[in-house]
UniProtKB/Swiss-Prot annotation:
Gene this protein is translated from: BZ2
Alphabetical list of SUPFAM superfamilies matching this protein: GST C-terminal domain-like, Thioredoxin-like
Binding site for glutathione: S9, K37, I51, E64, S65
Keywords linked to the UniProt accession: Transferase
A GO-annotated cellular component: cytoplasm
Pathway: Pigment biosynthesis; anthocyanin biosynthesis
Protein name, UniProt field: Probable glutathione S-transferase BZ2
Length: 236
């Protein structure tokens, strides 16, 4: 399989983490992260023109990171490759629904708030974005308490992360870069002790070590995005 994506893209990391956890060999086809879309990307994802895109061996394409992760899980289950301790989604229908719900929350609420911290046009907007990020993390702290059953990961297991772990874990490099750039503490032992422990366990997992980009690389990319955002403000 091949993945159209970017090394520092958190959504690409989410798809790659799922492939890595499932032991699926793939090739990362690097796409430039900018306003100009390649013909290859537009052909693979003509609806949104966004990464990541999972290119199947037969030429078909699957878009959107959360959809890609669930596709990988569905294939593993149908082929008999999903064992009880390595499921990305729980067997229980209610728990599956809850994991999907919180994945949507991360994408719709947490990530836009975190992204706005670094790209906010004014100090006031940045302070509001940081407050929104902390509010989202507070809710995710409670979600971890409810979903993990006292275990290491959101998945409810100690050995392997699941869908919800990948959904939040793919943003850890961006979160740490944001903290470093702006002198913030967003996930820490005082405000979110459960997430603090989880973040350390997730970052130490072999799949995360293989896939997640170095924080400094994300810092440099974020600075590039900040310059772009400032330029757009000046020319608008």
């Amino acid at each position: 399989m091949r993945v159209l994506g970017g090394e520092v893209s958190p959504f690409t990391a989410r798809a790659r983490l799922a492939l890595d956890l499932r032991g699926v060999a793939y090739e990362l086809l690097d796409e430039p992260l900018g306003p100009k879309k390649s013909d290859r990307l537009l052909a693979a994802n003509p609806v949104y023109g966004k990464i990541p895109v999972l290119l199947l061996p037969d030429g078909r394409a699957i878009c959107e990171s959360a959809v890609i992760v669930q596709y990988i899980e569905d294939v593993a289950r149908e082929s008999g490759g999903a064992e009880a301790g390595s499921l990305l989604l729980p067997d229980d229908p209610y728990e599956r629904a809850m994991h999907r719900f919180w994945t949507a929350f991360i994408d719709d609420k947490f990530w836009p708030a975190l992204d706005a911290v670094s790209l906010a046009p004014t100090p006031g907007a940045r302070a509001q974005a940081a407050e929104d990020t902390r509010a989202a993390l507070s809710l995710l702290e409670e979600a971890f308490k409810d979903r993990s059953n006292g275990r290491a990961f959101f998945s409810g297991g100690d050995a392997a992360p699941g869908l919800l772990d990948l959904a939040l874990g793919c943003f850890l490099p961006a979160l740490r870069a944001c903290e470093r750039l702006h002198g913030l503490s967003l996930i820490d032992a005082s405000a979110t002790p459960l997430l603090d422990g989880w973040s350390q366990r997730f970052a130490a997992h072999p799949a995360a070590k293989r896939v997640l980009p170095d924080t400094e690389k994300v810092v440099q990319f974020t600075r590039f995005l900040q310059v772009q955002a400032q330029f757009r403000v000046h020319v608008s």
